[in-house]
Regions:
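Bacterial N-terminal signal peptides
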Residues: 6-16
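A short, polar/proline- and glycine-enriched secondary-structure boundary/capping micro-motif
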Residues: 105-109, 179-182
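Short consensus segments that form the blades of beta-propeller domains
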Residues: 23, 74-75, 108-111
Length: 195
């Protein structure tokens, strides 16, 4: 019986790349949602910098600040919300929310704050991408960092601030990453989305 279980486990490991032992079976990340102060500015930025294209737009929806929490547990503090969905190459979509909100917190979360997040865009030409951002008035936070050892060896990354102040990242690993030499399991790669 132990031998049968071992054989079945080996077949399972050999049969597929990323497997899910339990839980919800997902095909991937559908979208990343970002709150922005100006929807048109954000659409223009993602379009000109990364080639993202607007696909859908809904709203503005009037919100009732006196209403009780909705099914998602949110009690609206904003007056209205408009939502746009962008298609970004072969990766995840980006969902943009523009809340009209005189009461909301305008401070950006810092990297160490709970709830802080960032989105990373893959490019084979990180130097060219950094030059483009700088030429277009985008604040790049330091110089690209090249990882020279460990699981992320071969990866280069740099963070930048969007026009509205969100932390974002450029990442590049055209020749792969260090972990690939020791593991058959692969992280999703936008250059090879089906692998």
């Amino acid at each position: 019986m132990k031998r049968l279980a071992s054989c079945l486990m080996a077949i399972g490991v050999l049969a597929g790349g990323a497997s899910q032992a339990s839980g919800i079976r997902v095909a991937g990340v559908d979208h990343v949602g970002i709150n922005v102060p100006d929807l048109k500015q954000a659409e223009a930025f993602f379009g000109s910098a990364f080639g993202c294209e607007p696909v859908t737009r809904i709203g503005p929806f009037q919100l009732d600040p006196a209403a009780s929490a909705d099914a998602a547990g949110f009690a609206p503090r904003a007056d209205s919300v408009t939502i746009a969905m962008l298609r970004c190459a072969e990766g995840s979509n980006i969902e943009l929310f523009e809340y009209r909100n005189p009461h909301g917190n305008k401070d950006m979360p810092r990297a160490e704050d709970i709830g802080a997040s960032h989105i990373a865009f893959y490019t084979d030409d990180i130097g060219g991408a950094v030059s483009y951002l700088k030429a277009n008035g985008i604040t790049v936070l330091g110089e690209p960092v090249k990882m020279t050892s460990g699981d992320t060896e071969g990866e280069t990354w740099v963070h930048f601030r969007s026009p509205w102040g969100s932390d974002m990242e450029l990442v590049s690993y055209p020749n792969g990453k260090g972990y690939e030499r020791r593991s058959s399991l692969r992280l999703w790669n936008p250059k090879h989305p089906g692998q």
